[in-house]
Amino acid sequence: MKNKRSQNSPYITNSPYATLEKALGYSFKDKRLLEQALTHKSCKLALNNERLEFLGDAVLGLVIGELLYHKFYQYDEGKLSKLRASIVSAHGFTKLAKVIALQDYLHISSSEEISNGREKPSILSSAFEALMAGVYLEAGLAKVQKIIQNLLNRAYKRLDLEHLFMDYKTALQELTQAQFCVIPTYQLLKEKGPDHHKEFEMALYIQDKIYATAKGKSKKEAEQQCAYQALQKLKEVK
């Protein structure tokens, strides 16, 4: 039985991804490409989303960089870099991914399910990058730009430096100095992957107690994720 489309909708109504595609604002012509974008490497399948993630990282860096360049013409390179860093990160892409409930559609291993893998920023942000790569391959850069603009509008009440960027490490250090008279420390737990696609796992300690662990494409990104988690635990970030 063939998939059916409703008369007034471009989305296949009995497709398992119809709701996702509607939230995204794009219907994939090749559902296998969509499947691949949603498949994490933990599934041990021949096709997973790692290659698409690689492409999506480059596409999103360009799209978001251009968007910020045109929107914030009064900002210098330093401010633009801070804005971009807050969006082009595991935390930033996870925020956009959750707007479309991407976590509900991921294909992950049973062990990742047990460890709450659907909520891990490293997994969710990678899937988001892969998904955008899929859109780019089928529909081009303009469609990705339109989707990202829409998701940013839905994810953030205001898109500016004050509301979008926060240096979580600085905020955490100020808080721990005020509350505990100490500063947090960071330790590298693991480093893996080839030079062009590294992944770092960092741990954050306060008074010799581990408060958070996180992964990122750089030590700085992983440390920011750790700081964000610690701030949440300390009720500083809601």
Curated annotation (Swiss-Prot):
It comes from the Bacteria. InterPro entries: dsRBD_dom, RNase_III, RNase_III_dom, RNase_III_sf. Keywords: Cytoplasm, Endonuclease, Hydrolase, Magnesium, Metal-binding, mRNA processing, Nuclease, RNA-binding, rRNA processing, rRNA-binding, tRNA processing. Residues 17-140 form the RNase III domain. Pfam families: dsrm (PF00035), Ribonucleas_3_3 (PF14622). The active site is at D57, E129. This is Ribonuclease 3.
